[in-house]
Amino acid sequence: MSPPVAPPGWSRWLVPPAALSVHLSIGQAYAWSVFKPPLESALGLSGTQSALPFQLGIVMLGLSAAFGGTLVERKGPRWAMTVALVCFSSGFLLSALGASLEQYWLIVFGYGFVGGIGLGIGYISPVSTLIKWFPDRPGMATGIAIMGFGGGALIASPWSAQMLESFGGDSSGIALAFLVHGLSYAVFMLLGVLLVRVPPRERSVEGGPSVLAGPQVSADRAIRTPQFWCLWIVLCMNVTAGIGILEKAAPMITDFFADTSTPVSVTAAAGFVALLSAANMAGRIGWSSTSDLIGRKNIYRVYLGVGALMYALIALFGDSSKPLFVLCALVILSFYGGGFATVPAYLKDLFGTYQVGAIHGRLLTAWSTAGVLGPLIVNWIADRQEEAGRHGASLYGLSFVIMIGLLVVGFVANELVRPVDPRHHVPAPKEAAHVERQQSESA
């Protein structure tokens, strides 16, 4: 399947809807916490066990993005979106089978492993294409697409909760909900497959700079630079801090206010998940667009510095005020989403657009690491605290202190980012081909 090149006159504004159709679908991953309570009840799982499909999905997202990034660059976004469609939908179908048979390992394999591959390939598939279509506004462009990933749970959370209420929270009801998800997302993602196009190579797009303007760094050279690894740490720390809340959002707010006169209902908890998704989505377009104005390093200073302050406020005062808890969580999740949306533009600023998709894919191994660290820290500590007889907000106090420390580490790593040494730059593809041709002729 060759990359579909846009014909003359093709509007670049048709590409973001194609990206959104994929990212809104795979963004369902952020609504996994809605399935945790019924799975724990139906299959007798602990909080740590019920997080496994989500954790494995994030691990596979990073690994498939890292190993598939170069392939996606070569084969193009339509091929990648097709692979994502097949894997993501198949993951739900396998999970439906696992739930109906009450075989939890099959849910972990289907949603986590197979679906996780779809997450990774689907996540990176439109990003480099959008950067090439919008070289003049890379932060806004990637924010539009990645906004969909953050907003997917805004749709999926109440939708999933309604299905579980209608179908029932037992294993058969969960299986039917998984089945409906898989089939519905397959249809929606197909729209993106049919619509996506790539810009003509090395041509300016609507008066902007050339698609390959400026210094370029290959993916192989990029991972040898300190800038890549500083950004890896920045992304890992920011994601760990956000994903720790997001993965356990519904039970967390219920636990936090369980001992108050106005406990949080299941419906309200699902609404909280939807609010977090809205903040996640808004942060992806809002903060990433802001980065086009104030710069990538400055916006990450906000994400990491203010994020640490928000965690401190929750740890100190969160259980005394629902509005404060919700507000701080929303700010943290907006920074979490903004961090994802801004990092492709940060990579473009440092390494150019030549292989930015492949570089982005390799950087997403930081997400894989964070996908294990965040839920593990929050769930494991909460389980141990519960075993010790503690309850309510005390289940999460130590976790939040750890998150503050991780954000400080990320802040320091961001301060260490500097422009890439010119020795890592490579010739643009045309120039490189000309040099190789001269060398072969002289030989």
How should each PLM-predicted stretch be described?
Residues 235-244, 267-343:
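C-terminal transmembrane helical hairpin of 12-TM major facilitator-type secondary transporters
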Residues 137-158, 361-375:
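Glycine-rich segments within core transmembrane alpha-helices of 12-TM secondary carriers
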